[in-house]
């Protein structure tokens, strides 16, 4: 069985967010998918299986800890690889069926790689935190809040607590404790700290062990929140930054359409192509 290593939200190879893509994982069990993700040590891996409809694939995304119902950069990276393997012409369109959501992705060849853009649909705006609760979350990251803006839970498939912090607060941020229960209590799965003026953000897994380089599932909520706050207009693309503090600067292109759908896109570079030696049956 073959798999590929790609870089997403990357203007060149060895930048952006790395990803392992298995283009035909039809014979793998969920247990094998989870174990392979742990073996490869990527923040996320994506496993595809072709469906009967043209350019349609089932997709399952795993972190080293669990399966996710939705993710951003794995979807874009997978679509770019599908274009490389099956697209042929300069432009293509794909439909990925995740466990709880279907996502349409447009891809095109660009420079030495690909550009992929997905429609995440409309954002769902959740709980707005009061001052005390927002301060508690900021303290959990040893960060300083930007009190000009509200902290709010927003989702385009995964619910994020969007926590505005100062520029210095973003640079100094370090998650000090597990936030699983605290986030669940407000209807969020992750926290995303953002320097509003710089359009830059950071996020960690709920345990605070691993910082993500570029988070497409957070980019949609951030874009929708910014438009709702009047910081950016609808129907006008803009870029978000992430990964600088990990030495992997990444650009995430976003746009909220007049209808309210959120588009998230970025460049994808193919890095490596490999083959598993055990058979799927040997992997369990």
List where the protein language model places each region.
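Active-site proximal loop and beta-alpha junction motif in alpha/beta enzyme cores
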Residues: 1-70, 76-284
